[in-house]
Amino acid sequence: FILNPDVIIHDDILPQMAQWLLDHPGVVMATPQLYFPDGRIQNLPRRKPTPWLLLARQLAPRFGGVMQKADEHYTMQDEDLTIPRPIEFCTGSFAAIRTDVFKTIGGFDPEYFMYVEDADLTQRALRQGLVYLLPQFTATHAWHRDPMRDAGKFKMQLKSMGRYFKK
């Protein structure tokens, strides 16, 4: 399991998620539905990042319109996320990944300090099998979008995105 320190696990889901993965051998990585501490859903299941979708993600809050529609597509708001389903980008804040797959793909790329490392890991895991959202399992994540508030972190995110798209 990959867990950020700001994740609160509900209902002893780790063994349940592990069993779900054992029961579904074609799935190599999965994430539960994450919620903010106030109970709102975090829209973390995503499609494969593209430069356009990441730009739209950053600009949607300010400009809406086509940027908002692209962001909703990127965050899969046009899909039924209440049932287990394949996804293309598994958040690194809480993910279950098969140990053999994690070892085969070499774990996290050490060239990423922060940001986009989870997208990279997901894309390499997808070469080994399916990646799933498991909304029947839930956790709370006290997530903050720091890059938009801190120029240094935003620069770090841009550097990571550049590396990701060069791969």
Language model features: what each stretch is:
Residues 85-86, 95, 99-113, 119-140:
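Catalytic donor-sugar/metal-binding loop of nucleotide-sugar-dependent glycosyltransferases
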Residues 49-87:
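Short, flexible, basic/aromatic active-site loop/helix in glycosyltransferases
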Residues 1-8:
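Short beta-strand-to-loop acidic/aromatic patch adjacent to the donor-nucleotide binding site
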Residues 10-44:
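Conserved donor NDP-sugar-binding/catalytic core segment of glycosyltransferases
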